[in-house]
Amino acid sequence: MIKNRVNFFIFIIILLSVVLFFLRIHFLLLLRTEMKFKEVASCFEEIEPVSGRLEITRLLAALFAKASPQEAEIVASLSLGQLHPPYIGTQFNIAEKNLIKAVVQLLDIDEAAIKSEIKMAGDIGLVLQSHGWRTDKELSVADVYKTLCRLEEISGTGSQEEKIQLLSDLFLSLDPLSAKFVARIILGKLRLGFSDMTIIDSLSWMHAGDKSLRNILEDAYNVCADIGLITQTLKEGSVDAIKKMHVTVGIPIIPAAAERLPTAQAIFEKLGVCFAEPKLDGFRLQIHIDKTNKKEPTIRFFSRNLQDMSSMFPDLYQAFLKLDISNLICEGEAIGYDPDTNEFLPFQETIKRKRKHGVEQAAAEYPLKIFLFDILYLNGQECLNMPYIERHEELQRLLSDTSIELIQVNEFKKITDAKQLQDYFFAAVAAGLEGLVVKRPDALYQPGKRNFNWIKLKRQEEGHLEDTLDCVVLGYYAGEGKRAHFGIGAFLVGVFNKKADMFQTVAKIGTGLTDTEWKELKKKCDTLTTHTKPKNIECAKELTPDVWVTPQIVCSVRADEITQSPLHAAGKTAEKLGYALRFPRFMGYRPDKSVEEATTDEEVKRLYEDQFVK
């Protein structure tokens, strides 16, 4: 009897403890208020002068920890200067001159005076911050986000005036510090100096207290390239929820990439029996097709840097519409060709398709075909974990019963010895192609990974490196002599150090551009100028350009060789010299690549070592 009473009292105590626990949680939730945008701005202000990635990661982790799942999703996007992931895009369509009008309206100051202040400060955000005005409002993160989305949506007659008024009202409701960062987001000049990979690190620190979750988070991001969605999923659920993230038609997969080796012999020694495909100098596309709604099928074309390029390819849209499938994700190389000779055109001709207006005319002027080389998803089934050879067979079956002229499966050939690979390579080069991509037969498709499952073998021109490098423009030098009136005479480029999330100098380029291209380059750079060196650029004092540029422009560079350098930062350590390009020459822009897809310092190091392979 006594024992039963004791058990009853223990049960009552446990029950009361549970009830009190949930009441406490409920009370805390009631007390919780929306995150104010001022908190985000204060964090950005702390991050701005910091160059160390670990400290930036710590500050971001603390910010995400305080946010709700929905707020964390917004903060992740805003911290990269965007409202939406790249595959949706962010377009405010408001020029700085109209932003200035909003500031004039806000501060009731002469426009000429504001322009003078901006010229002195070099940043409209700093000018806003310097003018202290009082506001009784404290807008939440959600409030600011909704207003920015509204700003993006306004269009049509009188839209600019409406945007100016909306901006002026928004600034008036913000404190000056918050207004500074909002203005920078709108102009695409946030410049916090970190990428999506730093956000992934910060999420790991937030959840686990270390970077142990980085690989899990990165794998999820690679198959679902939406950093906001990754952030929200982790905050809402758990690591298990992240592990369950999967391929979704309409959300691009971060493409797999190929490594380099200098010779056919080296590749065969690495892979053994393998398959080789011609390497085409075209526009790599990831095609997403959803025909589950027969009346309104969706076909989208994503570039390798995840931008939606669907408007460029009306002809390919019609071609893919003919495929008898429910849904599909595949990859291919779109390349322009001369319809009279059927010969392929250089990349710079293919890229002329990229325009906002006159797309139908461009399609007629620059006809193209697409050569598919991989399939990632078909009729509800992921194909990522299928071996390469099975994926290729699936691709061939998909097109075996069709005769769609614009869509073809890229040629591939089984290779059983190094000589056969060398002969196939020479045949590809003789046909005017770049070379080969050689693939391991049992390789799974690994999104976002660059490894030796795929290996590039490219033609080598006498006295030149066997490959071009994709470099990022970091700044430019004032012109002298003939180029004085251009205002630019040379420019500084760098490569990407993924581990440090930094861009390291590798060359100063002064050749390879026509007069028109010099003017075009300066125009591109002048939209990205910054008065101080961006903190994600590593550059020796002796190489300091006259004008710094926010790293956003990727260009193709050819050089005679790679040399060791005491000045350039690429690959440089306390014990080792850096690397530099000898006789670098500009070959064209790579608008299909993001700066994070540029050549890395590790690749430069391997290219340097490959020069000594006979």
What are the functions of these language-model segments?
Residues 7-29:
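Hydrophobic alpha-helical signal peptides and transmembrane signal-/tail-anchor segments
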Residues 528-582:
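C-terminal structured "cap/appendage" subdomains that terminate the fold
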Residues 288-290, 447-451, 467, 483-489, ...:
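Short glycine/proline-enriched turns and hinge-like loops at secondary-structure junctions
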Residues 310, 503-540, 549:
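A short-motif feature that recognizes glycine-rich, charge-decorated loops
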Residues 27, 31-417, 498-509, 537-542, ...:
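N-terminal nucleic-acid-engaging modules of covalent nucleotidyltransferase systems
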Residues 429-433:
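Detector for conserved single-position "signature" residues within domains
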Residues 1-5:
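Short alpha-helix boundary/capping segments
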Residues 256-275, 421-424, 442-481:
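Flexible, glycine/threonine-enriched loop-and-boundary segments that flank and lead into catalytic domains
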